[in-house]
Design a protein with these regions (language model features):
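Substrate-binding/active-site clefts of carbohydrate-active enzymes
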Residues: 1-75, 106, 123
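Active-site-proximal helices and loops of the catalytic beta/alpha 8
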Residues: 3-10, 14, 71-74, 82-182
Protein backbone atom coordinates (compact mmCIF):
# COMPACT_ATOMS: atom_id res chain seq x y z
CA UNK A 1 0.00 0.00 0.00
CA UNK A 2 1.02 3.63 -0.38
CA UNK A 3 0.98 3.91 3.42
CA UNK A 4 3.69 1.29 4.01
CA UNK A 5 5.22 1.09 0.50
CA UNK A 6 7.73 -1.67 1.17
CA UNK A 7 8.19 -2.39 -2.54
CA UNK A 8 8.62 1.32 -3.36
CA UNK A 9 5.84 1.24 -5.91
CA UNK A 10 4.60 4.70 -5.01
CA UNK A 11 6.57 7.83 -5.78
CA UNK A 12 7.22 10.68 -3.33
CA UNK A 13 8.29 13.14 -5.97
CA UNK A 14 6.28 15.91 -4.35
CA UNK A 15 8.34 15.50 -1.15
CA UNK A 16 5.32 15.45 1.15
CA UNK A 17 6.55 12.41 3.04
CA UNK A 18 3.83 10.23 1.62
CA UNK A 19 6.30 7.65 0.40
CA UNK A 20 5.25 5.19 3.05
CA UNK A 21 6.43 4.28 6.52
CA UNK A 22 8.87 1.65 5.26
CA UNK A 23 10.81 4.25 3.26
CA UNK A 24 10.95 7.16 5.65
CA UNK A 25 10.63 7.76 9.36
CA UNK A 26 9.32 11.18 8.33
CA UNK A 27 6.37 9.61 6.55
CA UNK A 28 3.08 10.78 8.00
CA UNK A 29 2.15 7.10 8.15
CA UNK A 30 5.18 6.00 10.17
CA UNK A 31 3.30 5.99 13.51
CA UNK A 32 0.71 3.61 12.09
CA UNK A 33 3.23 0.77 12.24
CA UNK A 34 5.46 -0.77 14.92
CA UNK A 35 9.04 -1.19 13.77
CA UNK A 36 11.39 -3.23 15.95
CA UNK A 37 14.46 -2.66 13.75
CA UNK A 38 13.80 -0.04 11.11
CA UNK A 39 12.98 -0.60 8.34
CA UNK A 40 13.15 -4.37 7.87
CA UNK A 41 11.68 -5.66 11.11
CA UNK A 42 8.15 -4.70 12.05
CA UNK A 43 5.10 -6.26 13.59
CA UNK A 44 2.95 -8.05 11.07
CA UNK A 45 -0.38 -9.81 11.11
CA UNK A 46 0.18 -13.41 12.19
CA UNK A 47 3.88 -13.05 11.26
CA UNK A 48 3.17 -12.56 7.55
CA UNK A 49 5.65 -9.87 6.49
CA UNK A 50 3.53 -8.73 3.53
CA UNK A 51 0.79 -7.78 6.01
CA UNK A 52 2.30 -5.16 8.33
CA UNK A 53 0.22 -4.72 11.47
CA UNK A 54 -1.50 -1.35 11.71
CA UNK A 55 -1.84 0.47 15.03
CA UNK A 56 -5.59 1.10 14.91
CA UNK A 57 -5.40 3.21 18.09
CA UNK A 58 -3.05 5.82 16.62
CA UNK A 59 -4.85 9.18 16.58
CA UNK A 60 -3.81 10.04 13.02
CA UNK A 61 -4.98 6.62 11.85
CA UNK A 62 -8.35 7.09 13.55
CA UNK A 63 -8.62 10.51 11.92
CA UNK A 64 -7.77 9.13 8.48
CA UNK A 65 -10.12 6.16 8.64
CA UNK A 66 -12.98 7.52 10.77
CA UNK A 67 -12.94 11.09 12.08
CA UNK A 68 -11.80 13.49 9.35
CA UNK A 69 -14.37 15.06 7.04
CA UNK A 70 -12.70 13.28 4.13
CA UNK A 71 -12.06 10.04 6.05
CA UNK A 72 -12.38 6.64 4.41
CA UNK A 73 -15.66 6.00 6.24
CA UNK A 74 -17.17 9.37 5.33
CA UNK A 75 -16.11 8.96 1.73
CA UNK A 76 -17.92 5.67 1.23
CA UNK A 77 -20.98 6.51 3.32
CA UNK A 78 -21.41 9.79 1.44
CA UNK A 79 -21.37 7.83 -1.82
CA UNK A 80 -24.23 5.66 -0.61
CA UNK A 81 -22.64 2.73 1.20
CA UNK A 82 -25.05 1.64 3.90
CA UNK A 83 -22.52 0.00 6.15
CA UNK A 84 -19.36 -2.03 6.52
CA UNK A 85 -18.26 -5.56 7.34
CA UNK A 86 -15.18 -5.73 9.53
CA UNK A 87 -12.95 -8.60 8.51
CA UNK A 88 -11.42 -10.46 11.47
CA UNK A 89 -13.19 -8.26 14.03
CA UNK A 90 -11.50 -10.01 16.95
CA UNK A 91 -8.15 -8.65 15.74
CA UNK A 92 -9.40 -5.06 16.10
CA UNK A 93 -9.23 -3.19 19.41
CA UNK A 94 -12.50 -2.29 21.13
CA UNK A 95 -11.69 1.42 20.92
CA UNK A 96 -11.49 1.23 17.12
CA UNK A 97 -14.78 -0.63 16.72
CA UNK A 98 -16.54 1.67 19.20
CA UNK A 99 -15.22 4.83 17.56
CA UNK A 100 -16.21 3.56 14.13
CA UNK A 101 -19.75 2.67 15.19
CA UNK A 102 -20.23 5.91 17.12
CA UNK A 103 -19.17 7.95 14.10
CA UNK A 104 -21.27 5.96 11.65
CA UNK A 105 -24.43 6.20 13.77
CA UNK A 106 -23.98 9.93 14.46
CA UNK A 107 -23.84 10.79 10.76
CA UNK A 108 -25.73 7.91 9.23
CA UNK A 109 -28.11 6.48 11.88
CA UNK A 110 -29.34 3.69 9.61
CA UNK A 111 -25.85 2.48 8.68
CA UNK A 112 -24.86 -1.03 9.72
CA UNK A 113 -21.62 -2.41 11.15
CA UNK A 114 -21.19 -6.16 10.79
CA UNK A 115 -18.27 -8.13 12.17
CA UNK A 116 -16.63 -11.32 11.04
CA UNK A 117 -16.63 -13.36 14.25
CA UNK A 118 -16.26 -17.10 13.76
CA UNK A 119 -17.51 -18.15 17.18
CA UNK A 120 -20.54 -17.16 19.27
CA UNK A 121 -20.15 -13.37 19.33
CA UNK A 122 -22.20 -13.02 22.52
CA UNK A 123 -19.49 -14.57 24.66
CA UNK A 124 -16.36 -14.38 22.51
CA UNK A 125 -13.03 -14.35 24.34
CA UNK A 126 -10.22 -12.89 22.27
CA UNK A 127 -6.64 -12.44 23.44
CA UNK A 128 -7.63 -13.23 27.01
CA UNK A 129 -10.61 -10.95 27.48
CA UNK A 130 -14.32 -11.03 26.77
CA UNK A 131 -15.39 -8.96 23.78
CA UNK A 132 -18.40 -6.62 23.93
CA UNK A 133 -19.54 -6.96 20.33
CA UNK A 134 -23.28 -7.21 20.96
CA UNK A 135 -23.71 -4.93 23.97
CA UNK A 136 -24.78 -1.86 22.00
CA UNK A 137 -21.57 0.08 21.45
CA UNK A 138 -19.83 -2.05 18.83
CA UNK A 139 -21.40 -4.28 16.19
CA UNK A 140 -24.94 -4.30 14.84
CA UNK A 141 -24.61 -7.91 13.77
CA UNK A 142 -22.12 -10.62 12.85
CA UNK A 143 -21.57 -13.31 10.27
CA UNK A 144 -23.51 -16.38 11.39
CA UNK A 145 -20.71 -18.94 11.26
CA UNK A 146 -22.05 -20.94 14.24
CA UNK A 147 -25.20 -21.63 12.19
CA UNK A 148 -23.09 -22.67 9.20
CA UNK A 149 -21.15 -25.04 11.45
CA UNK A 150 -24.41 -26.48 12.82
CA UNK A 151 -25.81 -27.08 9.32
CA UNK A 152 -22.60 -28.78 8.17
CA UNK A 153 -22.64 -30.92 11.32
CA UNK A 154 -26.20 -31.95 10.58
CA UNK A 155 -25.38 -32.79 6.96
CA UNK A 156 -22.46 -34.93 8.11
CA UNK A 157 -24.24 -36.75 10.95
CA UNK A 158 -27.99 -36.40 10.35
CA UNK A 159 -28.33 -35.59 14.06
CA UNK A 160 -31.36 -33.27 14.20
CA UNK A 161 -31.16 -33.03 17.99
CA UNK A 162 -27.64 -31.61 17.77
CA UNK A 163 -28.73 -29.14 15.08
CA UNK A 164 -31.70 -28.05 17.18
CA UNK A 165 -29.46 -27.51 20.20
CA UNK A 166 -26.98 -25.41 18.24
CA UNK A 167 -29.71 -23.25 16.70
CA UNK A 168 -31.38 -22.80 20.10
CA UNK A 169 -28.05 -21.68 21.61
CA UNK A 170 -27.74 -18.98 18.96
CA UNK A 171 -31.35 -17.90 19.53
CA UNK A 172 -30.86 -17.74 23.30
CA UNK A 173 -27.51 -15.93 23.22
CA UNK A 174 -28.08 -13.23 20.62
CA UNK A 175 -30.18 -10.11 21.24
CA UNK A 176 -33.27 -9.98 18.96
CA UNK A 177 -31.96 -7.11 16.82
CA UNK A 178 -28.78 -9.10 16.16
CA UNK A 179 -30.54 -12.42 15.69
CA UNK A 180 -32.85 -10.90 13.08
CA UNK A 181 -29.98 -9.50 11.05
CA UNK A 182 -27.37 -12.26 11.12
CA UNK A 183 -25.50 -12.76 7.87
Amino acid sequence: SIYFNRKRRYDDSDGKGENGAYNSRNSKYYRWYSFTSYPDKYESWWGIDTLPKVNEEDESYLDFIIRDEDSVINHWLSLGASGFRLDVADELPDIFIEELRKHMKARYPDSVLIGEVWEDASNKISYGYRRKYLQGSQLDSVMNYPFKKAIIGYMETGDAKLLSGEVETIRENYPPQVLNSLM
